[in-house]
Regions:
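Conserved alpha-helix/loop element of class I SAM-dependent methyltransferases that forms part
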Residues: 110-128
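Conserved SAM-binding loop of SAM-dependent methyltransferases across substrates and taxa
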Residues: 137-149
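Class I S-adenosyl-L-methionine
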Residues: 243-280
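S-adenosyl-L-methionine
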Residues: 155-199
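Conserved beta-strand signature within the Rossmann-like core of class I S-adenosyl-L-methionine
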Residues: 234-242
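A short glycine-rich, Lys/Arg-flanked "PGG" loop and its adjoining helix->strand segment in the class I
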Residues: 219-233
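N-terminal auxiliary segments of SAM/dcSAM-dependent transferases
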Residues: 1-90
Length: 280
């Protein structure tokens, strides 16, 4: 799917453009792609010009919502297919996303992109073949590509999340020159697709599943046994667990995960907000 290259608006950025025009400015300099680049945007009574194309002034925009040009109007980047999936702006530039109002990436202390970079560094991706089990917005894959990964194979179960990626300038484009053919991105349920991955075929694994209550199969012993099967001896696995409240959940999910990974054939320890494991 081709990636969108038009303007992305928030209520704040649209208001900033309007104020600049109302003060008599003929143009405005800044970012309309969530901080990925800086542009000079021409302003007039009818709207603004971005990268050679004219756009009308948007109507009233909502807070905590990103808008893209759909060919006729500025539309929110959200879809409903049983669940409401939405791309959400952050103060850091790189957006997060929500499913039914539940934030899927941490953003309170640092950018979700920088958070992904810290985790990717744990598996030392340079030159390696990596399995990225739950692609999401692709921040693990993007950071691995930046770090010189040899090849990364990524799965995403939700077609609407894949659509979000095409509108997010922070998500990697498998067809881009910078990816260089190293990112293989597939629509599929990794709990099933893992059975087709050859044994001893990957050097490292990045596993960022939804929380246990949504995707328990991705925390199962059966799935961990498959991860142990496909990764080579000495290979590193980072498993995101988050830090669920033990008092309210009654469970210590990180330690449960570590115990199952040990049983599957890894040496596991708690790291960041998850578990780092090495195949024995």
């Amino acid at each position: 799917m081709p990636h969108y290259t038009g303007p992305l608006l928030t209520r704040d950025s649209a208001d900033t453009l309007r104020r600049a025009h109302d003060k008599g400015a003929a143009d405005w300099q800044g970012s309309l792609d969530l901080g990925r680049s800086q542009d000079t945007v021409a302003l007039d009574a009818d709207g603004f010009h971005f990268r050679g194309q004219a756009y009308p002034w948007p109507g009233k925009l909502k807070d905590r919502t990103l808008y893209y040009w759909d060919g006729e109007d500025f539309a929110p980047i959200s879809r409903y297919s049983g669940s409401l999936i939405k791309l959400v702006p952050t103060e850091w530039g790189a957006p997060t996303f929500e499913i039914d109002g539940i934030k899927m990436l941490p953003t309170s202390k640092l950018s979700p992109f920088e958070d992904a970079r810290r985790k990717v560094e744990l598996v030392a991706p340079a030159g390696k073949i990596i399995l990225d089990t739950c692609g999401g917005l692709g921040y693990f894959a993007a950071c691995a590509l930046e770090a010189g990964v040899g090849q990364i194979r990524s799965f995403e179960k939700n077609a609407d999340v894949m659509w979000l990626r095409t509108l997010n300038p922070w998500s990697p484009d498998p067809d881009s020159a910078s990816a260089g053919g190293r990112l293989q991105f597939s629509h599929g349920d990794v709990s099933q697709q893992i059975e087709q991955v050859a044994s001893n075929s990957v050097d490292a694994i990045l596993h960022d599943p939804p929380r246990f209550g949504i995707a328990g199969e991705l925390y199962s012993q059966t799935f961990y046994d498959h991860l142990a099967r496909v990764i080579r001896k000495g290979g590193r696995l980072f498993h995101y667990t988050g830090a669920p409240n033990k008092l309210t959940s009654g469970r210590d999910v990180p330690r449960e995960v570590a115990k199952r990974l040990e049983k599957a054939g890894f040496k596991a320890e708690l790291a960041l907000d998850g578990v780092l494991a090495v195949k024995r």
